[in-house]
């Protein structure tokens, strides 16, 4: 079942250590098949060096039950599941503890849009969620992690299709895209703009956000209705 999707998810997971986005077994990638109502996700705690496509776990979006697979799915599976339910435009999700994005998350800081590298992928400030409550942490923690992400986007009026990433306060980044590969691509860029942002803040603590006109130009030329960037 879903052998092609399993291979795609495996390859996307293997890309995480190659791009220095994970340490040890941290991090996970999933991808969804909406017609079948399932998603494929990395198994929990399996080393990237020995992981195979057969290790990938198929999970129901509706129930959260394992549909296929012999291993336990990632502990972050409920977060992925809720995001697939809440954001129907996304096809793949990545969670990492990449160093510089996690620094922003641990500081409880959103990443402002100060340059065109950021604007090419993220249409504005990359948000950081609020702190989770004790009840949320002690309850269905991973599910509530998804809820706090969705709450942040709803309260701030952010379109998940235009903002393919978020920082969870005191935790780390989640990124998404049209498929697993695209989600990893966005996670790589998220880490890079987080890295740049730290130095920008050191050099110019009062640096304002970039011009809205320039933000619009760079985002919309790649992603807008009249996009013209690329082949």
Curated annotation (Swiss-Prot):
The active site is at residues 120, 229. CDD domains: Aldolase_II (cd00398). Pathway: Carbohydrate degradation; L-arabinose degradation via L-ribulose; D-xylulose 5-phosphate from L-arabinose (bacterial route): step 3/3. Induction: Induced by arabinose. Transcription is dependent on the transcription factor AraC, the cAMP receptor protein (CRP) and cAMP. Also induced by L-lyxose. Substrate binds at residues 27-28, 44-45, 74-75. Its EC number is 5.1.3.4. Zn(2+) binds at residues 76, 95, 97, 171. Disruption phenotype: Cells lacking this gene accumulate large amount of L-ribulose 5-phosphate when incubated with L-arabinose. Belongs to the aldolase class II family. AraD/FucA subfamily. PANTHER family: FUCULOSE PHOSPHATE ALDOLASE (PTHR22789), L-RIBULOSE-5-PHOSPHATE 4-EPIMERASE ARAD (PTHR22789:SF15). This is L-ribulose-5-phosphate 4-epimerase AraD. It comes from Escherichia coli (strain K12).
């Amino acid at each position: 079942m879903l052998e092609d999707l399993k291979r795609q998810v495996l390859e996307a997971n293997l890309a995480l250590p190659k791009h220095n986005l994970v340490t040890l077994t941290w991090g996970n990638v999933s991808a969804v098949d909406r017609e079948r109502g399932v998603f494929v996700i990395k198994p929990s705690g399996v080393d990237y060096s020995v992981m195979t496509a057969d290790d990938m776990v198929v999970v129901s979006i509706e129930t959260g039950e394992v549909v296929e697979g012999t291993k336990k799915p990632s502990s972050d599976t409920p977060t992925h599941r809720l995001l697939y339910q809440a954001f129907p435009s996304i096809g793949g999700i990545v969670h990492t503890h990449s160093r510089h994005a996690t620094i922003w998350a641990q500081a409880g800081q959103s990443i402002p849009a100060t340059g065109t590298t950021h604007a090419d992928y993220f249409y504005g400030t990359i948000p950081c969620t609020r702190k989770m409550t004790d009840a949320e942490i002690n309850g269905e923690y991973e599910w509530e992690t998804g809820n706090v992400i969705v709450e942040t986007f709803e309260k701030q009026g952010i379109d998940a299709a235009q903002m393919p990433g978020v920082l969870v306060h005191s935790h780390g980044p989640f990124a998404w895209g049209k498929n697993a590969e695209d989600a990893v691509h966005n996670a790589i860029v998220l880490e890079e703009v987080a890295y740049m942002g730290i130095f920008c803040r050191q050099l110019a603590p009062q640096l304002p956000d970039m011009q809205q006109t320039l933000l619009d130009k760079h985002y919309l030329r790649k992603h807008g209705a009249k996009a013209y960037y690329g082949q």
